[in-house]
Design a protein with these regions (language model features):
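HotDog/MaoC-like acyl-thioester-processing domains
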Residues: 1-4, 63-65, 76-119
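Hot-dog-fold acyl-thioester-processing enzymes
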Residues: 1-54, 108-119
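Hydrophobic beta-strand-centered segment that forms part of the acyl-chain substrate-binding groove
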Residues: 35-83, 96-98, 104
């Protein structure tokens, strides 16, 4: 499990003081950074190897500006060329959002998926 702390910004709030729903998927992506490094250690797009093929977000509770959030990220399932990431956002000990992302190990030069290495 990977734990990532994020401090909400004023610009991420809406008119009633909640964190706007569009930022939850962005925060989830921030939590995937170390998983990205497994496939592209330098995080450079010349050698990028992942294609996002599905993302789901479930909003469970409200998020606010006043307290930092914790993104919890883990790999749930690994297939031949794809893997599934489970994600949660917690704030003040409350589960506020959960999601899932599926990535394919992808060769962009050859335009095709590739098997995930055991390394």
């Amino acid at each position: 499990m990977i734990f990532t702390k994020i401090v909400p910004r004023v610009s991420e709030t809406d008119g009633v003081g909640h964190i706007n729903n569009v930022f939850v998927p962005i925060w989830f992506e921030a939590g995937r950074r170390e998983i990205f490094r497994i496939f592209s250690p330098k995080l450079d797009f010349l050698n990028w190897k992942l294609a996002l093929v599905k993302v789901t977000v479930e909003y469970v509770d409200q998020l606010y500006l006043a307290a930092e959030v914790e993104i919890r990220t883990g790999i749930e399932k690994v297939g031949n060329s794809s893997f599934t990431i489970k994600e949660e956002i917690h704030q003040t000990k409350r589960l506020c959002a959960k999601g899932e992302a599926i990535y394919v190990n992808y060769n962009f030069q050859e335009n095709k998926s590739e098997a995930i290495s055991n390394e």
